Amino acid sequence: PQEIQVFRPQSWGLIQTAGKKLGIEVVATRRTIALKKQLQQQAENYHNANYQPLSIESPPPQPIPDVLMGDKWQFVTLTAKELVTEFNDRPIPIVSMPDYLLPPHWGLGANVAIPGVIIYGGKQSMRLARWIAETEPVSLDYLGDDPGGLVLDAGLADRWVMVTFNDPEVSRAAKLYEARKKLVHGLHFLLVTPDDSGITDSGIWLLQK
């Protein structure tokens, strides 16, 4: 093989060492789709209830650096068609929308609503987008603690608190955001933009829970 993908943090060091000796690139990623599918199928035939082959122990979420905090943010939706075509003609510096996550790959129609979050980063927009890219984001999820918040799962097991809130109306919107994700195979997106002018964007990521 030319590449080995690893999704378990505990396995990373050992496999990376072996890969160097064999001249094989080792990539840390949670997107080991075929492997996880096979492990899940095996788990269905395993009678030990404690056997969770896809379970990863994650540390408590950490707040993002204060200097990266955006000016404001909001929940939004785009149709599957808009998500695929809306950003093609825009000169966005950071775009992460792999083909295997695009709505057509999941059999979703053009008018299906894909939930997302926009962060208006102001003067720090590009800096925030670069930081998010470096974390290798996987999903952006609502945690309904008190206060509630949106947590970015990234890398192999990292978790970052992007925003917090305790407003009941925002909490209801967050629950709707999560419900919509479940209707579209966990697909959602994160857009970082300087402001709401619609003229420029800093980065967009298509994510999946």
Residue ranges, per PLM feature:
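Secondary-structure boundary/capping micro-motif
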Residues: 1-209
